[in-house]
Amino acid sequence: MKAIILAGGESSRFGKAKAFAKIDNQYFYQKIIETLKSTNMFNRIIISTNSQLASQFEYEYVIIDDEHHQNKGPLTGIYSVMKQYMDEELFFIVSVDTPMITSKAVNGLYHFMVSNLIESRLDIVAFKEGEICIPTIGFYTLSTFPFIEKALNSNHLSLKHVFKQLSTDWLDVTEIDSPYYWYKNINFQHDLDSLKMQINE
């Protein structure tokens, strides 16, 4: 099983590439890699990013966005990695701006997926916060690839457009025994400042 860290966004609201923001004296991407490795679930953890940022990662497995679909958001990142690993059946997706994700969250979502997979024939299993879906923390089967490709080719670039066409299920973030901020994504500098305060409470 492969894990994909989506790190190709422009980060214009944050002011710099969020992958290289720091929490607990680690870059976001390094912290997420460490967490994913601790699960022992993945035979490879891949950073998906754009050509401008690729050389800045001190990491072996970096895939650059497909040249035909650059600057099209998270769908491009997922597509670009899946395209390189068409023999893989399942991918875990996480956005680089979710640095506090925990191994309990990854394991919890995986077990939720396995317990529902056969009965529901699921394509995507991800988290939700109440009624709000969080598709950038989830498991995607390879069966999603043609739908992602079609969406990119037709410039329907929202993940919502894709998962509406597929069999999906959602696990509420409150089901995970982790600090309440584990799934929070960082969009602005004040989000990071707030997160640091919450960690130190």
Curated annotation (Swiss-Prot):
It holds the Pfam family NTP_transf_3. It is an enzyme of class 2 (transferase). Mg(2+) binds at D97. It catalyses: Mo-molybdopterin + GTP + H(+) = Mo-molybdopterin guanine dinucleotide + diphosphate. The N-terminal domain determines nucleotide recognition and specific binding, while the C-terminal domain determines the specific binding to the target protein. Disulfide bonds: none annotated. It comes from the Bacteria. GO terms for molecular function: GTP binding; metal ion binding; molybdenum cofactor guanylyltransferase activity. Its EC number is 2.7.7.77. It is found in: Cytoplasm. This is Probable molybdenum cofactor guanylyltransferase. One of its GO terms (biological process) is Mo-molybdopterin cofactor biosynthetic process. Keywords: Cytoplasm, GTP-binding, Magnesium, Metal-binding, Molybdenum cofactor biosynthesis, Nucleotide-binding, Transferase. The keyword Cytoplasm applies. It comes from Staphylococcus epidermidis (strain ATCC 35984 / DSM 28319 / BCRC 17069 / CCUG 31568 / BM 3577 / RP62A). GTP binds at L6, A7, G8, K18, D65, D97. GO terms for cellular component: cytoplasm. InterPro entries: MobA-like_NTP_Trfase, Molybde_CF_guanTrfase, Nucleotide-diphossugar_trans. Belongs to the MobA family. Its cofactor is Mg(2+). The gene is mobA.
